[in-house]
Swiss-Prot record:
Pfam family, one: Lipoprotein_18
GO biological process: Gram-negative-bacterium-type cell outer membrane assembly; protein insertion into membrane
Assembly and oligomerization: Part of the Bam complex.
Organism, scientific name: Thiobacillus denitrificans (strain ATCC 25259 / T1)
Function: Part of the outer membrane protein assembly complex, which is involved in assembly and insertion of beta-barrel proteins into the outer membrane.
GO CC field: cell outer membrane
Homology family: Belongs to the BamC family.
Name under which the protein is recorded: Outer membrane protein assembly factor BamC
Gene, per the UniProt record: bamC
Lipidation (N-palmitoyl cysteine): 17
Length: 367
C-alpha cells in the first residue's frame, strides 16, 4: 500500500510527458492578461462593430480566421481587420529582419497586441504616438528542467519553480510605402550569484537573442496568414552584405548607411529598441528620435529578501530612473545614403565619448 502514492505520482507525471518538452517557447507572465483594447489614438470612433473583439466562445483568444468568418456575416463599407488576399513577407538588411504586412497600422495594431497576449505576455506599454507595443517581463517555462518530481508538483503549484532568465519584446509599427512594417526586438535578463557564497543573486542584462526574435517573427507571420513552410523559408534567407560604417573625426563619430532616409529611419528605430533605448518621442520631419537609455537595474529591480516566494512576483513594472535625454538624428546624405549622429537633449553636440559609445552600439545592429 505504501507504493500506491508513489505509483500515482509517477502516473500523473507520465500523463504530462511531452507537454512542455514539445515546446521550445512557453512564456508566462505573473499577472492576469488585460482585456484586448484598440488604442483610441489609432482608431477613430465608429458606429459599426468592425473593431469588436471576436466571439471565441469563452476561450479568451481571437484568431484571424475566426475574426474573418464572423465579419463575413456583417459586411461593412470599409475592409475588416485583414483582407483575406493580403500577404505578409520578410525584408532584411544586414543582421536585421522585419515583417511587412499589406494592411494599415490601425488594422495591424490589435492583431499584434492579441498575438503577445496569446503567447503568454502582458502588454506593458502601448504608445500609438511612437508606434510601440512592449510586453512585460516573462519567463520561458519550457526552459525549466523536467523530472518526475517537478512535473508532479507543477500540477499543483505551477509557480514553485522558475528559470533564471526573463525576456521582454518590443514591437514597433511603421507605415511604409509597401504596407505596414513590423519591427520586433528582444531584451533579456539573467539571474546570477552576486557573492562567492552564493547566498545572494542579482539580475543583469544578457544579449538579445536573434534566434528568439526569428521564432517570434515566424509565429507572427503565421498569425498573418503565411503558410508555415513559407514562413521558415523567408526567415532563413541569406544575410545581406554590410550596409553601414563608422566615420570618426576629431569631434566624435557618426554612422553612414547605404540606405535612403525612409529605410534608414525605420532601421535606426529598430536598432534603438535592441540596444536598450526608450524612444520617448520622434520627429520624422527632422529625422530625430528623442531617447533615454533604459537602466537595467531600474527596469528590472527585484524585491529583496522577502523569502522564497518573492521570486514569483519578481517582474513588476517600474518607471525608468531619469537619465539624460539624447537625440539620435538621421540625415539624408544624397546618392542613396544616410548619416546617423548623436546630439544632446536640446540639440547641442554630445560629448565625444557618448557619441562613440552609441554609434558603436548602433553600428553592430545596422551593419
Amino acid at each position: 500500500m505504501r507504493l500506491l502514492p508513489l505509483f500515482l505520482m509517477v502516473t500523473l507525471a507520465a500523463s504530462g510527458c511531452g507537454i512542455v518538452e514539445s515546446k521550445k517557447i512557453d512564456y508566462k507572465s505573473s499577472n492576469k492578461l488585460p482585456t484586448l483594447e484598440i488604442p483610441p489614438d489609432l482608431v477613430a470612433p465608429t458606429a459599426d462593430n468592425r473593431y469588436a473583439i471576436p466571439d471565441t466562445e469563452g476561450s479568451g483568444t481571437a484568431t484571424l480566421s475566426t475574426y474573418s468568418a464572423e465579419r463575413k456575416a456583417a459586411p461593412s463599407g470599409t475592409p475588416s481587420l485583414l483582407p483575406a488576399q493580403d500577404k505578409a513577407r520578410i525584408e532584411r538588411a544586414g543582421t536585421q529582419r522585419w515583417l511587412v504586412v499589406q494592411a494599415t497600422p490601425q488594422q495591424v495594431w490589435p492583431v499584434i497586441k492579441d498575438f503577445w497576449q496569446e503567447n503568454g505576455f502582458i502588454v506593458n506599454l502601448e504608445s500609438p504616438e511612437t508606434g510601440v507595443i512592449e510586453t512585460d517581463w516573462a519567463e520561458n517555462r519550457a526552459k525549466i528542467p523536467q523530472d518526475v518530481i517537478r512535473r508532479t508538483l507543477g500540477k499543483v503549484l505551477d509557480g514553485l519553480y522558475s528559470t533564471a532568465e526573463r525576456d521582454k519584446f518590443r514591437t514597433r509599427i511603421e507605415a511604409g510605402s509597401g504596407g505596414t512594417e513590423i519591427y520586433l526586438s528582444h531584451r533579456g535578463m539573467m539571474e546570477v550569484y552576486a557573492t562567492e557564497g552564493k547566498d545572494k543573486t542579482v539580475w543583469q542584462p544578457r544579449p538579445a537573442d536573434p534566434e528568439l526574435e526569428a521564432e517570434m517573427l515566424r509565429r507572427l507571420m503565421l498569425r498573418f496568414g503565411v503558410e508555415e513552410n513559407r514562413a521558415q523559408t523567408l526567415l532563413t534567407a541569406k544575410q545581406t552584405p554590410d550596409q553601414a560604417r563608422v566615420i570618426r573625426d576629431a569631434g566624435g563619430s557618426l554612422l553612414e548607411m547605404d540606405e535612403g532616409f525612409d529605410r534608414a529611419w525605420r532601421r535606426v528605430g529598430l536598432a534603438l529598441d535592441r540596444v536598450g533605448f526608450a524612444v520617448e518621442d520622434r520627429d520624422r520631419s527632422k529625422g530625430t528620435y528623442f531617447v533615454r537609455y533604459i537602466d537595467p537595474d531600474a527596469d528590472n529591480a527585484s524585491k529583496r529578501d522577502e523569502g522564497m516566494f518573492a521570486k514569483l512576483a519578481f517582474w513588476r513594472s517600474k518607471k525608468d530612473q531619469a537619465s539624460p535625454q539624447l537625440q539620435i538624428v538621421v540625415d539624408e546624405a544624397g546618392e542613396g545614403k544616410s548619416r546617423v549622429r548623436v546630439a544632446g537633449g536640446e540639440g547641442r553636440a554630445a560629448d565625444a565619448a557618448t557619441q562613440n559609445r552609441i554609434i558603436n552600439l548602433l553600428h553592430k545592429e545596422l551593419k
